[in-house]
A protein has these predicted regions:
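Single conserved hydrophobic/aromatic residue that forms the stacking wall/gate
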Residues: 1-15
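Active-site and donor-binding regions of nucleotide-sugar-utilizing enzymes
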Residues: 13-177
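Donor-nucleotide binding loops and adjacent catalytic segments primarily
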Residues: 182
């Protein structure tokens, strides 16, 4: 089994979906994971997911497929923040540390593309702290980013954050792939 979460509206997500569907002996399950805005008073407001999926994609409600019980071979997800996003969150059952504990391979692919970043652009490089050093990247077995240049910056950023002795770990798990977009 391969469980894909969130929207497939972006070109690269459709490419990934089709790639997994083309693999022999692979059952692909797509779920739109519930997302919540955090309110100023500390509460949560459910986001009305208006993500449109291509007609050929069947969405399996979270109530109908429980990855905790099914233990899929791979989970592919796009939300790295867990509870570190000040504006929104998902239910903790969908946080990366839980996902990682219930699959053979956890794969993170960013839900966005950035412009290519020059490592000398300190503003852009500093901003990478907001999405690179997040739990989803750390807990994943595999991270697919848009280019070799971005891959090198992820490795550099994570190595700076976690220490020189971790560089080989990041280099082994982060790969550049065609994730589409502009």
């Amino acid at each position: 089994d391969c469980l894909l979460s969130r929207g497939l509206g972006d070109v690269y997500k459709r490419q990934i979906y089709k790639q997994y569907c083309g693999e022999e002996n692979t059952r692909v399950i797509v779920q739109s994971v519930p997302y919540y805005y955090k309110t100023v008073n500390g509460g949560f407001e459910k986001y009305a997911d208006s993500v449109s999926y291509p007609d050929y994609v069947t969405i399996t409600p979270t109530e109908e497929y429980n990855y905790l019980e099914e233990y899929p071979d791979e989970i592919v997800f796009q939300y790295p923040y867990d509870n570190y996003n000040s504006a929104g969150t998902t239910d903790s059952v969908f946080h990366s540390y839980n996902l990682a504990s219930h699959t053979l391979r956890l794969t993170y692919i960013p839900y966005f593309r950035t412009d290519e970043i020059d490592e000398n652009d300190m503003r852009a490089y500093t901003n990478m702290n907001e999405y690179v050093t997040m739990p989803g990247v750390v807990y994943s077995d595999r991270v697919i980013v848009q280019s070799e240049g971005i891959r090198k910056l992820y490795i550099k950023k994570l190595t700076e954050f976690f220490g020189e002795e971790t560089e080989s770990e990041w280099a082994a798990k982060i790969e550049a792939g065609d994730i589409g977009g502009n």
